[in-house]
Amino acid sequence: MSRHWTIAVLGAGAWGTALALTMQRAGHGARLWARDQNLVREINNARSNSRYLPGVKIDPAVLATDDMAAALEGADCVLAAIPAQSLRSVLAVAGTALKAHIPVVLCAKGIERETGQLMSEAARQALPENPLAALSGPSFAADLARGLPTAVTVAAQDGALAADLAKKLSAPNLRCYSSDDLMGVELGGALKNVLAIAAGATSGAGLGASAVAAITTRGFVELRRIGAAFGARAETLMGLSGLGDLILTCNSPQSRNFAYGAALGRGERLDNLPLAEGVFTASIAARMVSERGLEAPIIETVNGMLNGGLTVHAAMQALLARPLKSE
C-alpha cells in the first residue's frame, strides 16, 4: 500500500478548502495556505470558512497558515487553488521554498489575461524545475466539501506522472482519471467559463431552456474547433474536463460564470458580484480565435456583451440571423 502524502493546498477559497478537506479524508496530511490572517484564524480556531464555504465544518486535522514556507515544508505535493490571474505571482513566492522535484497540480481554470498563457505555461515560468499537472472537471466546491461524489481529470504531459497523481489524489468521494493531454484539459476548463456566461445570460434574459440547450451544444462545437486548432484531442474535450464541465456550469447558478451571465441577462448591476474567471477569459479567447481565423460566434458574442456594449437580446438575434448551415 502506497504511503500517505503531506499535501500543501495554496489558496483557502471555496475550492482550496474543499480540496484540503478531501485530501484529509483520503488519509493525507493537509495544510492550507491563505494570505488573510483573519481567515487563517477562523479556520484554525472556529473550524469554519464562513466567507467562502459557509456551513461546512473543517476537520481539526486540516491546518491553515499564512506562512508559505511553513505550508510547503515537507510537502510531497502542492495543489495550487489560486485564481488564474494571481497564479503566477503566488507560485513565484512558493518557488523560493519549494523543492524542485515536488509536483504542483494546478487547480484553477483560466487563461492569464496579460500574456494569454494557459495556467501550465504561466506556472512553468514561475517554477521551471517542478513537475506540473492540472486538475479539472465538473466539480463544485460545496459538493466536494460535503463528501458528495465527484469525478475529475488529472493531466500532465508525462502520462506516468498523471496516473500516479490521479491515484494519490483520489478519495472516497473523488474519482480522478488521468490524461496526458494537458492542452485539452486546460483549454476545456478555461473556455467553458466563457460559454457558461453565454448560457447564464440566455437563462437570465428569460429566453428559455431550449435556447440554453442550443447555446451549450453549439458552444461545445466551438470548444472542439478551438481545441483541434491548438492540438487538443477530441476525446479529451468529450470527457470530464470538456463536455462534463460544460454541462455542469451551463446549467447551474452555483457556477460563478453562469450566475454572472444570468445577472447580465437580467440587466442587473455587476459591480457587486464576485468576478467570474470567464470575464477575464472572454477577450483573450476572442483574440485567440480571431488570430487563427476560427469560427466561434458564441465566444465572440460573449466578448461583445462584456466589452463591446452588446445587449443579450441583440446578441441572440445576431446569432439567430447567422447564415444557415449543416450541423
UniProtKB/Swiss-Prot annotation:
GO BP terms, alphabetized: carbohydrate metabolic process; glycerol-3-phosphate biosynthetic process; glycerol-3-phosphate catabolic process; glycerophospholipid metabolic process; phospholipid biosynthetic process
Bilayer-spanning residue ranges: none
GO cellular component: cytosol
Binding-site list for NADPH: 15, 35, 109, 141, 256, 275, 277
InterPro entries to which the protein is assigned, alphabetical: 6-PGluconate_DH-like_C_sf, 6PGD_dom2, G3P_DH_NAD-dep, G3P_DH_NAD-dep_C, G3P_DH_NAD-dep_N, NAD(P)-bd_dom_sf
Major place of residence: cytoplasm
Catalytic activity: sn-glycerol 3-phosphate + NAD(+) = dihydroxyacetone phosphate + NADH + H(+); sn-glycerol 3-phosphate + NADP(+) = dihydroxyacetone phosphate + NADPH + H(+)
Active site: 192 (proton acceptor)
Localisation: Cytoplasm
Pathway assigned to this chain's UniProt record: Membrane lipid metabolism; glycerophospholipid metabolism
Superkingdom to which the source organism belongs: Bacteria
Family label: Belongs to the NAD-dependent glycerol-3-phosphate dehydrogenase family.
Protein name (Swiss-Prot/TrEMBL): Glycerol-3-phosphate dehydrogenase [NAD(P)+]
